[in-house]
Amino acid sequence: MSEKCAAVILATEENPSVTTYRSIYMMNLLSKPIVGWVITALRRCGIEDISVVVSDNDVTITPYVELLGCASYKRKQIENESIDFMKKHCEGNILVVRGDAPFIDPIVLRNALLEHENNGNEVTVVSTQVDVPFGYSRIVRGDSGELLSVVEEKHAAADEKKIREVSSGSYWFDAIMLLRSLETCVKFHKDAVDNAVNEIVAFGGKFGAYYADSPDIVLRASNRRRLLTLNEKARKNEILRHIEAGVDIPCVDGVMIESDVEIGVGTTILPGTILRGKVKIGKGCKIGPNTLIENSTVGDNVILNETQCYQSTVKNGCNIGPFAHIRPNSVVGDCVHLGNFVEVKNSSIDTGTKVSHLTYVGDSDVGKHVNFGCGTVTVNYTGRAKFRTKIMDDAFIGCNTNLVAPVTVGAGAYTAAGSTITEDVPDSSLGIARARQVNKLGWRINKDNE
């Protein structure tokens, strides 16, 4: 990638045929806004200077793209201030792309730039061939294959509409020539973006096309039916990417893997698994069925069965589930077992600890090789504030124990089943906090005789 390159994303169209409270550019593709896919592709292409042009009525795109470090301009603002805008980028090349085409390929963009520079073009369009060209601008060539023009669908003649080579909506421009064309467009009150190519050709600028083999680069979310198609396409693309990298996905039913997910070799993904956000999974794991992981890190040789995990870390060799829930800010150490109906929140659980069933561990720091009996609850909330529970190495927590924070159970200490522990239990001690059992002999006989 050349050092002096910038990109402009066009996200200005308002589509009344799409029933939504959000812009089409902000509709999700695998839980990520479409314009976010475009920004990611540009970053992978090596472009950091990215501006997004939005409609004058937009209220949803601007906050999102600015959060991603992109500049944002209203359409009327960019038309009125286009000259000043371009002068900021008057060296090098500028890439103009559509904001509703999520499958633009960074490799294609880089190769198109190389051809643009090597051929000395003032403008280079990225084109491809589609089976049904309706709705796309046609690439018109001469008898010897030379590029003559790019014609919009609404302006195309009958013979031009039969052409199957179409524009992807992505153009590399020489910045100085684009600046000159914009000056003319503004002077004649034309649409600066749509007419820039025609103005450059009128100036005698050199016009070229880079042909992309995959027609996916032109796919757009023009309506909800098309969005459904794009989602399925994106889902299959991600699944294939991981299969080719050595991940085992024997059945793809219900599997959804987002674009920022990393999965190690030899890991198996079972049906109903959803991997969302920035997820990193190690080697040799078994994930699923019916498991959701979001913005989390999972180590090697981990089993996650019927489990949900959010913004947490699960280290090597853990066996988790079924029906476990790992809530944000939790760290589950090596070889930890979390069984059925176990919930962990904002807690650290160290190596070899077993929490087998029906237990809540919240706001807690748990040591190594601790055993939790069934029905243990860390009572962390007073109604006004939350406190932490500390359980040291090799402790044994009896069934149906309530640990009322702030409280510490010492190393090697035990709590008796059914206890409500409100005071610290010293190391190697037994904490008993329950009423003494009383047996009333013959009570049933007397009751029946009443």
Regions found by a protein language model. Name each.
Residues 5-6, 20, 25, 39-41, ...:
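Catalytic cores of nucleotide-enabled group-transfer and carboxylate-activating enzymes in metabolic
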Residues 13-15, 57, 99-102, 130-131, ...:
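Short glycine-rich anion-binding loops that position phosphate/pyrophosphate groups of nucleotides
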Residues 167-170, 259, 387, 405:
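Glycine/small-residue-rich pyrophosphate-binding loop that anchors the diphosphate of NDP-sugar donors
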Residues 2-62, 70-73, 109-115:
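N-terminal glycine-rich phosphate-binding loop and ensuing alpha1 helix
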Residues 147-240:
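Catalytic-core segments of class I nucleotidyltransferases/pyrophosphorylases
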Residues 304-450:
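Glycine-rich hexapeptide-repeat left-handed beta-helix
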Residues 62, 66-144, 180-183:
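Conserved beta-loop-beta/alpha segment of the NTase-like Rossmann-fold superfamily
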Residues 201-308, 314-317:
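Extended, small-residue-rich solenoid/repeat segments and analogous flexible loops
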